From Swiss-Prot:
Pfam families for this protein: RimK, Rimk_N
E.C. designation(s): 6.3.2.-
Cofactor note: Binds 2 magnesium or manganese ions per subunit.
Class in the EC hierarchy, top level: ligase
Gene Ontology MF: a single term: ribosomal S6-glutamic acid ligase activity
Protein name (record): Probable alpha-L-glutamate ligase
Stretches assigned to the ATP-grasp domain: 104-287
Keywords from the named record: ATP-binding, Ligase, Magnesium, Manganese, Metal-binding, Nucleotide-binding, Protein biosynthesis
Amino acid sequence: MKIGILSRNPELYSTRKLYEAAIIRGHQARIIDPLLCYMTIASQRPTIHYKGEELTGFDAIIPRIGASITFYGTAVVRQFEMMNIYSVNESVAISRSRDKLRSLQLLSRKGIGLPHTCFAHSTRYTKDLINQVGGAPLVVKLLEGTQGIGVVLAETQKAAESVIEAFKGLKEQILVQEFIEESGGADIRCLVVGGKVVAAMKRQGAEGEFRSNIHRGGKATVVRLTPEERATAVRSAHIMGLNVAGVDILQSNRGPIVMEVNSSPGLEGIETATGKDVADEIIRFIEKHTKPGRTKTRGKG
């Protein structure tokens, strides 16, 4: 097969590993910067050009679309779909997962465990908003934030009011969520491929840090999932319509709590922590499921 890997940086660990895994499995592979693609929207023959040449002959693509290029990146993925090329994660599913509010609404509809969350436009009822999530301490989260950026722990009522009003004063869209204290600054990242958890790690935040992101100094170790945690991760990926997903779970007193479903999960941390070859699992999944025109939208909402 001929596989395109949509990534802006060929030197990134995840991009490199996917490229190498495809080559090892006997496929042709090419890394394509989606921002350098340009497309012709035509009813009879849609095309994509890249650096002056038309891209042809691809059987499948692996989108590695960063949050900062979601709009254009998903447009490129959608154009490949219009050309009957299989995408391991579809454009609509990527867009769905990038909208934190939409994701939470879809997951809640299906009964997935979530943190108590509020969303509001006005700061007029901030006190009641805070009460709705159980009061301080609470977490204020930018809708557009990634890798722990734009996530603030407000430990008191006064601090919570100040943070919410400050973000709103900057015209930012925010979520207000309960703080799951019993998680102890740790979460579980489950890597789901084709409806199965192929690897899982526990990430512990640095001392004094409630965010567990490895980018912020968190430490990763292999973890054994409970059946409920495994089922929650698989169901969450399915609800979002993602074949490949990183599902972030907190362990709470009321069971697994899903914090995020990521459509372009990094591979370095989880492969290093678990010793699992996740890139190989993704290529094997593509081998089994690639068919021309197989771009039926998965998930709803």
